[in-house]
Amino acid sequence: MQKEKGNIYIDGLELNRDTIYNIRNKIGVVFQNPDNQFVGATVEDDVAFGLENKGIPLEEMQARVKEALELVGMSAFADREPARLSGGQKQRVAIAGAIAMRPNIIILDEATSMLDPEGRLELIQTIKEIRDQYNMTVVSITHDLDEVALSDRVLVMKKGKVESSSTPRELFARGEELLTLGLDIPFSANLISTLKDKGFEFTENYLTEKELEDQLWELLLKA
């Protein structure tokens, strides 16, 4: 897709024909359906595939594959066929393949949308740990509020344009306006709204669940 106007910069580089190869090497992508990304006969082979294409020396490649699988908790499955894994395990392998390439940026395109709630939360936590350990930029394209809550910055897209740029707290404080953006209202924001209607006083429209728990205890102690 070509830009209509202006310039695009990624990690300080302007995107053009001369820089596109270097920029591609800076980015790893994990898609919604991991089955569409698997090419190796085993988990280990699949994680190594991109490294082989780049001509990474064998010893370094083996070390990277081992480290990436350890990071996502899939070392014990190195010799398994990807097709025999669960949905959550497949996504972990796909993320390991991206991490092994040592990108500066990882793009997650609805990467947790096909998982059950437990698998989704586990994968989100894994991504957070990887981000913190490697200081990577993670761009997550998602409708999942748990993912949004862990982000530093949220860009809301509406009809192909940036509707807003804010912190998760600022976004969630918009209450029922979120529904018009195709998003759900967080549980804590819903509960605060209900409690306000019943006469309880809150200074915020949104709190994290831990903050809400603390404030509810304060309200109960005052009652």
Predicted feature locations:
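Conserved catalytic motifs of ABC-family nucleotide-binding domains
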Residues: R102
